[in-house]
Amino acid sequence: MTTINHTLGFPRIGLKRELKKAQENYWAGKISQQELLETGRELRARHWEQQKQAGVDLVPVGDFAWYDHVLTTSLLLGNVPPRHQNPDGTIDLDTLFRIARGRAPTGEPAAAAEMTKWFNTNYHYIVPEFQQGQEFKLSWTQLLEEVDEALSLGHQVKPVLLGPITYLWLGKVKGQVFDRLSLLQDILPVYQQVLAELAKRGIEWVQIDEPALVLELPAEWLTAYPIAYQALQGQVKLLLTTYFDSIGHNLETIKSLPVQGLHVDLVAGQDDIAQLHESLPKEWVLSLGVINGRNVWRADLTAKHQLIKPLVGSRTLWIGSSCSLLHSPIDLSDETALDAEVKSWFAFALQKCEELALLTAALNQPDGSKQAELDAYSAPIRARRESKRVNNQAVTERLAAINPQDSERNQPYLQRAEIQRQRYNLPLWPTTTIGSFPQTTEIRGLRLDFKKGRVDGTSYRTNICEHIKQAINEQERLGLDVLVHGEAERNDMVEYFGEHLDGFVFTQNGWVQSYGSRCVKPPVIIGDVSRPEAITVEWAKYAQSLTEKPVKGMLTGPVTILCWSFPREDVSRETIAKQIALALRDEVDDLQEAGIGIIQIDEPALREGLPLRREEWQSYLDWAVEAFKLNAAIAKDDTQIHTHMCYCEFNDIMPSIAALDADVITIETSRSDMELLDSFENFSYPNEIGPGVYDIHSPNVPSVEWIEALLRKAADRIPVERLWVNPDCGLKTRGWTETRQSLANMVQAAKRLRESVK
């Protein structure tokens, strides 16, 4: 039996972020839709060929998306929210963008669909909306067209399709409450039609993604799997594909399904492959996800080979990435500035394809002729363990010296709140922003010139100070109560801090997609983390010197830095988080000593870091909360600690949110129509809350009346004296014109509400 390999998906964005640039140029009216479509065709063709040349046997098709693959599935099924539908009922590319962004180059603006995290990753998907009685039909043939493209180019094609149960699981009911699982019988005919079309094209295998099978699903959802897959069997072979965790707890359901293969994630999951082999039907393909699709580290192919070798010859095996390579940068060979030793520790998406090819070749040659090549490839991993770049004795000793008091504020919240009220004397409904202001071409150019050495340090600081002054002046003109310095010096909220902490390295082109056209370049944590000098104090102190109003110091929290970086694999996530917390603890102390009395520690990734299995939640939450408190607890009683979170379902982690003991929490709520506040109301959350009153991911400017209505809904749930007024998130990606208009309306809404309670 010959072992073959495949990937579950490949990055869409292009090595130079070509897709992002084409999307944004199209949205700005700078290129035509035809030019955008051509960019997509070029990227797909390039990526298929690159995988083939790297040695991938089955090329995934259908992993490309114009915004998000879940949204693509919604269009495939004809699931378009009524507010986004074209008058004639047709679906086009602008329909897709209107759902995701709230507007498109054609069509009237309408509230964007909700966006949330894809399982426990930093990728976001557009949440499907379901209404009772809605109809589904094959309406968007992108998958079929792309399969035709790939076939015409001579590739061995494996279409990728998000499975029906996971699709329904990921969505939300809008309007009248009903069980969205009841829609299964309505969407299955569309899936049948798609599979029939693929069969007509001679497709043998379809990768049907059901990552919901790694979750602890309710019984009725598990029961739906046999129903769904009985309906889908027979037209093509189905590779039931799971990832992000193990599937042992759902194995009885899985092995009863009429599919022809199963893919398991052996990186994030802990499934015993010998047990899987014994449990699964002998005729099934067992696809082993042994190459990590979510990191940048070179694989220990010697160890992987030893793991898989005992199964060779006993059943048909495929070797694959643990999940889609969407979460990995594209090509390490493009990194010309990385230190050679550090570079030898890494593998990006294309290198992971090459790892699959080498591992497959070794498994197909049982005489051991590839063993030396495997060992040579894996040698840098062993060398890394002893590297001085990795180990810092001072950090180890400081971590060991932590005591319980280091994580506790001096006074409880109620006493602190009174002290802070006396210091700041803020009005009811105090207004603020989340941190960043628009990153103009001028600002980005300045940072690039400084990085390239075209601008010296003195000139750079002078220019950044001018941008800070502009941000302060804009906020004072608008009438905001608590100001920010605007973060002109920051490229990314995680990358910026990583650049100033020991233990991190950075890539030139290590971009990954976060959502739509939003790409991030995560730092890589390669060793013990420490802070050699103050990071933000200079800018915050200057901003505060320009105004009598309080200016917030802005930090990214330890859990978010961990979650939004590529972490080490040789120590626990808890250890890394606490190392970062100790480094940022020193920053909090330096800020307050410099006169900064309000300090925001952003933790948007706190919930994202949760394990997918609920039984593992509490252990994670305990150390995540401890890391935040270790970061913040050095603050004096009159120093007000804010935190910010977004895209969260808070209800099931409210005790941990409260345990953070932040004086103020600001959250993303506008897309959910303030529903997220229900969790805080039901829990009787004791501290102050700033519910986001407008969606910064959409260019739409909210009206005063819209914001006022949302704030009144908030006041129905939270006492007015504990409410703040702010946007959902930072304003980095917005333009100044819409930012001024939106913030002016926000301030005006707050003033109206103050008048109404006099």
Curated annotation (Swiss-Prot):
The active site is at 697 (proton donor). Keywords: Amino-acid biosynthesis, Metal-binding, Methionine biosynthesis, Methyltransferase, Repeat, Transferase, Zinc. GO terms for molecular function: 5-methyltetrahydropteroyltriglutamate-homocysteine S-methyltransferase activity; zinc ion binding. Pathway: Amino-acid biosynthesis; L-methionine biosynthesis via de novo pathway; L-methionine from L-homocysteine (MetE route): step 1/1. It catalyses: 5-methyltetrahydropteroyltri-L-glutamate + L-homocysteine = tetrahydropteroyltri-L-glutamate + L-methionine. InterPro entries: Cbl-indep_Met_Synth_N, Cobalamin-indep_Met_synthase, Met_Synth_C/arc, UROD/MetE-like_sf. Zn(2+) binds at residues 644, 646, 668, 729. It comes from the Bacteria. One of its GO terms (biological process) is methionine biosynthetic process. Catalyzes the transfer of a methyl group from 5-methyltetrahydrofolate to homocysteine resulting in methionine formation. Belongs to the vitamin-B12 independent methionine synthase family. This is 5-methyltetrahydropteroyltriglutamate--homocysteine methyltransferase. It comes from Photorhabdus laumondii subsp. laumondii (strain DSM 15139 / CIP 105565 / TT01) (Photorhabdus luminescens subsp. laumondii). The lineage of its organism: Bacteria, Pseudomonadati, Pseudomonadota, Gammaproteobacteria, Enterobacterales.
